[in-house]
Amino acid sequence: MILNFNTSFTLKKKFILSIYPILYLFIFISCNQEEKATISPNIIWLVAEDQSPEFLPMYGDLSAKLPHLSNLAKDGVVYTNAYSPVPVCAPARSAIISGLYPTSLGTHNMRTYNAYNKKNQPAMGIPSYSPIFQSGIKMFPRYLREKGYYTTNNSKEDYNFKKTEGVWDESSKKAHWKNRKPNQPFFSVFNFGITHESQIWRQTNQPLLVKPEMLTVPPIFPDTPEVRKDLAVNYSNLIRLDSQIGKVIEQLKSEGLYENSIIFFYGDHGGPFPRYKRALYETGIKVPLIVKFEGKKIADSINDDFISFIDFAPSVLSLANIKPPTIMQGKAQFGSYKSDKESEFIFASSDRFDEQVDRLRSVRFGKFKYIRNFNPKISNAIPVSYREQMPMMKHLNKLWENNQLDDNVSAWFKTPKPIEELYNLENDPYELKNLSNENDLQDTLVFLRERLDRWIIETNDLGEFPEKELIDKWFPKGKPPKLAPLNKIISGNKISLSHPDTGVSIVWKQVKDSIWSVYSKPLDYSESIQAKGVRIGYEDTSLLIFPHK
């Protein structure tokens, strides 16, 4: 067939003209989808100290009305199996900020780096120290800053190690997203101390906002006026917490930021009471977690997946469309890099608490929970001096001394502890009936025993070593090793910086500024700039100042 050139051209022209709108629409949609995929959402963390889910209405306890948190739950997802890997704050916070188990980091003891007291535990010969982390382990907000996020922390920095520069744009009691550039995405953390353990005795003379006689007393406590009073103080503190959280949520709404922001509400470990905080029982490690996604996606729903604090860092990076570093032990539970596999196990640890030393490990699989006590001669009710200030703790001690506690309560005080504990959490949520000697559960016992052994090896559990031995290994000269100087190359009016240790982060700032930025490209040599290298556990490099005067 011979085609007339003009006819062929006309047909081609008609085809192109007819398909152009379709191509344009396809390109337009594709670009919008690509743009949507790379949008950096605002992410806000609202953190309650020392609270278990069992005290909150979205988990079934209606003792205290918490309207702001209840509304957040309606707009988001309530997670019923969220866990801290350690039942106390500083080690737990080290897991949150790094994406790794405290037992792998060396932050498993409470405390290691003590910003409140440099002497730390002088009677034990334990100074304040910042463990040396494996190369490549960094505080995850720095990755957000590299992508252009404005990061704020209000205001607790009790990470159990000395933080490095370059992580936060602001970290203070005044830190807030409002100081960012116009339309700059932000990650903001707000810590609320009103529900902390210490507030049980510090708020004891404040008006109660619930009636003690209307409360349900957990079966691990005696039903006495003293116990009911402290329970009522906690519920009252939760009401005060709800009011404080409501103010942050109202700010987001008034600025038009609420709908399309991702909001986490969680507790940093279990409740403030004895056998809650510092205990490897569910009361000590299970935490409340609500996540409101952009546009209220999956709103008013419940999720039973296992989530650990080691998953928080990779999950936030994934939500920000940043690939989590492979060195993180946690997995992304949400976002662009969400893991294809659900978590099957929850692991947790317990070691030194202030001046008291013990060692326990636990693993949960399905409905079963296994706990190993490495020091059975030590009571679970170790006399931590900080906790001894609580009226309830004083009351329990007196009842124990007078042999006035029932079996459910006295088990926490008794020695020796069983070397192994096994519980069916569906039938026994407070872990009162140890099933480790049940014949029909021996296969389950052996399975969890071996799985815990494997986890200890796989994650290089540093709790295997005495704390002083770790300190001597990290600091043979009695102080943190100093990093080698930065390398610099000057080309024209630009200076490029590097460091032989790939685990070192380089930070810089103009001399007049107070905030350090993460180095990512050559700097202008004509400006007055300071730069240094930082790595967790090490003394910073010598300060590089240029141009030289």
Question: Which ranges hold each PLM region?
Answer:
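Short beta-strand-to-coil "C-cap" segments at the C-terminal boundary of structured domains/repeats
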Residues: 292-294, 425, 547-549
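Bacterial N-terminal signal peptides
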Residues: 18-28
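N-terminal secretory signal peptides that target proteins for export/translocation
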Residues: 1-13
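A short pocket-lining beta-strand/turn micro-motif at the edge of beta-sheets
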Residues: 418-421, 504
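Hydrophobic, well-ordered secondary-structure elements that form the walls
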Residues: 316, 422-424, 428, 448, ...
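Short secondary-structure junctions and interdomain/linker hinges
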Residues: 340, 354, 455-463
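Formylglycine-dependent sulfatase
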Residues: 3-5, 18, 31-414, 418, ...
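Short, compositionally stereotyped local motifs that mark structural "simplifiers"
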Residues: 3-4, 436, 443-450, 457-549
